[in-house]
Amino acid sequence: MSKLKISYSDLDSLSKKIYDKVRPNFCPDIVLGIGSGGWLPAKLVNNHFNVEIESIQVSCYNNRELSNIVESNFSKINSNYIINKKILIIDDVNDTGTTLGYVVDKLYNLACGEIELCAAVMHHKDKEKKYDILSDIRTRYEYANLADDVWIDYPWESN
């Protein structure tokens, strides 16, 4: 399988690209990094926004069905904390869409719909998704780069 190798320098450029796409129409109260791949991208994007930052751990395994997602630790991400907030969700890659779909559902339901969401990723894989974030009216969506369906080798990946 071919790989797309990403350097730390690339991540800086990609985070600036996300900021430039998101900022004109959405200024978050909170940047939320989905771990573990979205933690560093969230920090880098938040260097531009300079707002509160939170992180969650969400894992998706096997055939990437929603039922296979390991329940995340939403720590202080509860309805009182997020209601009427603008939250920018950051992850490294949108592969099947399952993780983003889970997080959008969870946040939207916790806030009883009283929330503004924007999700952004470093790479959006150009393939069919289990969850089509582009057609979900509950959230805006941006990505820095469109990628082929190849392995994306981020600096934090073990080889």
Language-model segment annotations:
Residues N25, D29-V58:
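Glycine/proline-rich, flexible active-site/cofactor-binding loop segments
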Residues S2-L4, D105-N159:
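PRPP-dependent phosphoribosyltransferase catalytic core
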Residues D20, K43, N47, D105-N109:
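Short, well-ordered alpha-helices that flank and scaffold nucleotide-derived cofactor binding pockets
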Residues Y81-H123:
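Internal catalytic-core helix/loop-beta-alpha segment
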